[in-house]
Regions:
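Alpha-helical transmembrane segments
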Residues: 2-45, 80-111, 147-170, 190-379
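Membrane-interface helix-loop junction between the first two transmembrane segments
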Residues: 43-61
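Juxtamembrane helix-capping/reentrant segments at transmembrane boundaries
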Residues: 58-72, 126-137, 344, 349
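Select subsegments of transmembrane alpha-helices in polytopic membrane proteins
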Residues: 69-81, 133-139, 354-364
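Membrane-interfacial loop-to-helix junctions in multi-pass inner-membrane proteins
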Residues: 95-103, 122-137
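Membrane interface segments of multi-pass transport proteins and intramembrane proteases
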Residues: 120-129, 165-172
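Hydrophobic cores of alpha-helical transmembrane segments in multi-pass inner/ER membrane proteins
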Residues: 139-148
Length: 379
């Protein structure tokens, strides 16, 4: 809205406001605004969560050192969502449809996380939503994102072609071109592979961030790095000069998502101030699912979802550790690969301090993200 006011309306009278035309300037302001919102509202949110006795439940089958965290205010993801969305609305172009797709995804997955946290914390059911109910809700939210993008594809704002890392020319299309355009209702079936793909990507990212959120500041620190990488990727994908030079799919309207990514970085930095070890607040599922939905949606829109294993490398490793642990336990008569899963608990059991695990995983996340950016030229 500030973009509309300062540039669209007041620029003819105050030429200085011309700077708000530039995406980099608005991204910087959005990031700073998001960080300040999180920093200044954080203490109030923590106080209110304590007043309502919304505290973390710690299972006794996890690391025993975590039992002291019982009662720490949780559901702090509400603060993250507010700190992301307000600056996005303030500093982005409200006529850009991709902004609203990202906002919808963040809110939808955040709502699923909120319901899960509410059941766990308020209703005192330790496991929250059942796995089936959670996956169903995630599928519905993912379908909503996919349908919105299909509509935008019809207006030629979006492409269903994938960008494949390391390959310049091969861009497989996630549409089935089996039906003639003269049969519009039948032709809609062409988008089934794309819709299924979007649902799977969003389920993967949301649950991966959720699994990583097990140590103070771990998930939010990795999110800062992943969102920073997405900020760069979004900007170059929307800039005709950079996209042409790097031979990326150029979609001019996706550039506005740089503001959204900047807000995500700023909000995450502000939240980390209170979530750093020893944490004063936890994000809960409302935060992890909202962030996972935001990361996955941005990657899908800029057609870089195949880079997600590198952009969010730690998220992927954490998820793989759980899959391997469960698979090994079921298929090898109770034998485990790791001392405990997810992966960060394995290193705790090896004797690493919580702070050491967190910082080393952040370093790993940074290395993965930097490699993701180098793939733009390694093709």
């Amino acid at each position: 809205m500030l973009y509309w006011l300062l540039y669209e309306k007041l620029y003819p009278f105050f030429r200085t406001f011309r700077i708000f035309r530039y995406l980099t300037v608005r991204t910087a302001f959005a990031s700073l605004t998001a960080m300040l919102i999180a920093l200044f509202i954080g203490p109030w949110v923590i106080q209110k969560l304590r007043e309502f006795q919304i505290g973390q439940y710690v299972r006794d089958d996890g690391p025993q050192t975590h039992l002291k965290k019982t009662g720490t205010p949780t559901m702090g993801g509400i603060l993250i969502v507010i700190a992301i969305l307000l600056p996005t609305v303030l500093w982005s172009d409200p006529s850009n449809p991709f902004i609203w797709v990202a906002v919808f995804s963040t809110l939808a997955f955040g709502a699923i996380g909120f319901a899960d946290d509410y059941i766990k914390v308020v209703k005192r059911r330790s496991l929250g939503l059942t796995a089936r109910a959670k996956l169903l809700c995630q599928g519905v939210a993912g379908t909503g994102v996919a349908v919105a993008l299909v509509v935008l594809e019809q207006f030629r704002f979006f492409s269903t072609r994938l960008t494949v890392p390391f390959l310049k020319q091969w861009r497989p299309d996630l549409q089935w071109h089996l039906w003639p355009a003269s049969l519009p209702y039948l032709a809609l079936l062409a988008f089934v592979p794309f819709v299924v793909w979007v649902i799977l990507v969003l389920m993967g990212t949301t649950n991966a961030v959720n699994l990583t959120d097990g140590l103070d500041g771990l998930a939010i620190g990795c999110t800062i790095i992943a969102a920073g990488a997405l900020t760069v990727l979004t900007y170059v994908s929307g800039n005709v000069v950079f996209a042409d030079y790097l031979e990326l799919q150029h979609m001019p309207r996706v550039a506005e998502l740089t503001v959204f990514c900047g807000s995500m970085v700023g909000a995450s930095i502000g939240f980390l101030w209170y979530n750093a070890h020893p944490a004063e607040i936890f994000m809960g599922d409302v935060g992890s699912l909202a962030l996972g939905g935001a990361i996955g949606t941005v990657a899908i829109i800029i057609r870089q979802e195949l880079l997600l294993p590198f952009i969010g490398g730690i998220f992927v490793l954490e998820t793989l550790s759980v899959i391997l642990q469960v698979g090994s336990y079921k298929m090898r008569n109770g034998k485990r690969i790791f001392k405990m899963a997810p992966l960060h608990h394995h290193f705790e059991q090896l004797g690493w301090s919580e702070s050491k695990v967190i910082v080393r995983f952040w370093i790993g996340a940074l290395v993965f993200a930097l490699f993701a950016l180098t793939t733009l030229k390694l093709r």
